[in-house]
Curated annotation (Swiss-Prot):
Gene Ontology CC terms, in alphabetical order: small ribosomal subunit
Organism in which the protein naturally occurs: Desulfitobacterium hafniense (strain Y51)
Keywords: Ribonucleoprotein, Ribosomal protein, RNA-binding, rRNA-binding
Protein's name in the database: Small ribosomal subunit protein uS4
Family per record: Belongs to the universal ribosomal protein uS4 family.
Pfam families reported for this sequence: Ribosomal_S4 (PF00163), S4 (PF01479)
CDD domains given in the database record: S4 (cd00165)
Annotated GO MF terms: rRNA binding; structural constituent of ribosome
Gene Ontology BP annotations: ribosomal small subunit biogenesis; translation
Database matches in SUPFAM superfamilies: Alpha-L RNA-binding motif
Length: 208
């Protein structure tokens, strides 16, 4: 399946919540869902039919996929991996998604959105333990140090971001704003993931 390249604000309206896909714009009055808090399309404002159990499960899966920018095949791969791990499957799934390099870059404040973080990673602006990594899906481990590549610190976009770096990252990572690095000090716990996600619905969908 090809990556969605249309208006991302439609995705937020489809899911009925802010997915924070456009960075700073999402925090302003220009956000589309603040102005049109209904689904896109001709019948977006109509009530429609009551969603089925399967429909609710599908929407939850689509919402999480869109938050993290993961395609269906890869998302299923994450689920299968989570299912093989010890512990609660849904929490395992979210933990894998949180460990993606593009998400870590976003959480550290080196990008204003996950899509921007994904693009910056692909362009080779980040290192892990001093080595350049340009794979957004790379899974970080405890002890990894994620940093902005030295040569990239002078690029206009990253220079702008680093000059106003004020994000407080989750407790499973430490940020050194002066060095433009972040250290993974633990794996994320469920309470660290402050997103309105009902992961049990995703597990139920794939268990059908």
């Amino acid at each position: 399946m090809a990556r969605y390249t249309g208006p991302v604000c439609r995705l937020c309206r489809r899911e009925g919540m802010k997915l924070f896909l456009k960075g700073d714009r999402c925090y302003t009055g220009k956000c589309a869902i603040d102005r049109r808090a209904y689904a896109p399309g001709q019948h977006g404002q109509s009530r429609g039919k009551k969603p089925t159990e399967y429909g609710i499960q599908l929407r939850e899966k689509q919402k999480v996929r869109r938050i993290y920018g993961v395609q269906e095949k890869q998302f299923r791969s994450y689920y299968d991996k989570a299912n093989r791990q010890k512990g609660i499957v849904g929490e395992n799934l979210l933990r894998l998604l949180e460990r993606r390099l593009d998400n870590v870059v976003f959480q550290l404040g080196f990008a204003t959105s996950r899509p921007e973080a994904r693009q910056l990673v692909r362009h080779g602006h980040f290192t892990i333990n001093g080595r350049r990594v340009d794979i957004p899906s790379f899974l970080v481990r405890v002890g990894d140090v994620v940093g902005v590549k030295e040569a990239s610190k002078s690029s206009p976009r990253l220079k702008e971001i680093l000059s106003s770096l004020d994000r407080t990252p989750p407790k499973w990572m430490n940020l050194d704003a002066n060095a433009a690095t972040g250290t993974i000090i633990a794996l994320p716990d469920r309470e660290d993931i402050q997103l309105p996600i009902q992961e049990h619905l995703i597990v139920e969908k794939y268990s059908r």
